[in-house]
């Protein structure tokens, strides 16, 4: 619907569409229309693909709260030993020089979180919530898949070192079904 409204707007118009972004939730922030005519959140404007001269100024694009909140998270030393931690933005798409950190990296970040590093209980909750979302990805996984990940992680914790090493070498993206 927002794409239809946007195509109806004049090509030179700089007003953003007044629709609700599909992925917007309670954590995406609520900013009203500058004129105060609507209480729906402002969706970032998308350049019109038919008009090559239409560009979106960077100042109007606001990152979602969940994506920007993870940038200031403390990353402490690994309790099981030194583990390399990627310094890439957690929600950024794969770039030409690298790729998005994998679930194991996010699991380690979640497990390495220390309450003492947070500014208080609310900040600790916010950081743990963001770390768990990065690791478990509830936006793309079902509840059953999330529970399976948690059970596997707990099982790995009690396995002997040799079995754990074999399990970590195995490709988890390939599944044999029957």
Swiss-Prot record:
<feature type="domain" description="SCAN box">
    <location>
        <begin position="107"/>
        <end position="178"/>
    </location>
</feature>
<dbReference type="InterPro" id="IPR038269">
    <property type="entry name" value="SCAN_sf"/>
</dbReference>
<keyword id="KW-0539">Nucleus</keyword>
<feature type="compositionally biased region" description="Polar residues">
    <location>
        <begin position="36"/>
        <end position="54"/>
    </location>
</feature>
<dbReference type="InterPro" id="IPR050916">
    <property type="entry name" value="SCAN-C2H2_zinc_finger"/>
</dbReference>
<feature type="region of interest" description="Disordered">
    <location>
        <begin position="1"/>
        <end position="107"/>
    </location>
</feature>
<dbReference type="InterPro" id="IPR003309">
    <property type="entry name" value="SCAN_dom"/>
</dbReference>
<comment type="function">
    <text>May regulate transcriptional activity.</text>
</comment>
<feature type="compositionally biased region" description="Low complexity">
    <location>
        <begin position="9"/>
        <end position="18"/>
    </location>
</feature>
<dbReference type="Pfam" id="PF02023">
    <property type="entry name" value="SCAN"/>
</dbReference>
<protein>
    <recommendedName>
        <fullName>SCAN domain-containing protein 1</fullName>
    </recommendedName>
</protein>
<dbReference type="GO" id="GO:0005634">
    <property type="term" value="C:nucleus"/>
</dbReference>
<comment type="subunit">
    <text>Interacts with ZNF202.</text>
</comment>
